[in-house]
């Protein structure tokens, strides 16, 4: 009896230790750089900070990062000299040049701080596509404002998942969902939906199990699957090759770059690649062209119509059916 109790104690202690060691990189301090007009765009519908905290509480994340807003490079440099910052978010709206200039200057001075850019609307994306090479010298990823403060939660989680991926998958056998999408407009819509679905399923699993007083809900939330974004074929293959045993789903667009060129069959080839690995990994194909439904069926993959008026519901339904957490 004492041996069995010792084993149970050791297992629980081990689980608790692992939970505590997961997600070593946490975004606690975010510097938001936006001129007064762009800042007004996100603040006009209510208290920005309260809404951010609300988004975190909705998914049982009790500690939201602190946002510090500044309107100029000089103000940004002052904050950076005074305290540690985990993530810099630059807003770009009417003035698209100044955020780029600031970003490059900050990258030279603080190369280890991740920078993301948030543009005000979809119409601004065309301009940034023309300067991609310059943009990504200092900016990690571009997102588009979709009217919801949830995009800020997603931006923080995107960086956290990317930074913690290797360690957490090895330490805690954490699961991974791969989203392959090169459209800024669409991944800015998909990621909030995916994170919400992942957090909902994780909470359902946690609350369906006997509660262990030694491990808080907050700690258990750390075992949620990571959502990893790839924007081309090679990035996706890298994730599949390195984290195959952890993958619980691949959601892929059809058309994106492969070997540096736009490939109309890239998503099809990627799912074929997944199938050839021999691992059982549920796959979903997403496309604006409804005729790709047939190709998805041939690959035994689910299909999502990107032009569907019920896109949010469709993603939720398909994710629940095909990406149910183990």
Region locations from a protein language model:
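Conserved acidic segment of CheY-like receiver
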Residues: 2, 7, 17-53, 67-69, ...
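Conserved phosphotransfer microenvironments
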Residues: 6-12, 41-44, 48-53, 62-64, ...
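Short, polar loop motifs at secondary-structure junctions
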Residues: 54-57, 121-123, 213-214, 288-292
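As written
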Residues: 130-142, 295-304
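Conserved small/polar residues in nucleotide/adenosyl-binding loops
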Residues: 321-326
